């Protein structure tokens, strides 16, 4: 059912080079499910269906909008992991300074629509949701709550700093206070 595979990525690091590297799975003999990396609407639908059943313990016929939101979020996370691990591998292979930003709050806003846009699969997600009987992606996006990581302008400013660093491909990590 699963195909054994290695992922070859081209990552633009902070040195502005596009060097291919082989992103090996962490444990020999691990398997990567190709459906968890697929970007077409069928793969997104299959990922959502699998997360509804295996992660949330729901059938598609009894799934609420919140269940579909969670399933879509998990399916998007699966697809983001390839990029995340590729970034970590670039940093591991070419150690460089990392910016550490400390803030009492980060007001990052809803993330699902942003992640869909960054992956380029907004239309594919909407097509997958139509197969569940949801006519508009906005119906599911409205379910997402604002992460409670701040309450004002400084939190939004901290989030803007982090987004700018990411856009400039500067290795950065944000540290906050959990209260």
Where are these regions (language model features)?
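A conserved ligand/cofactor-binding region detector
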Residues: 12-179
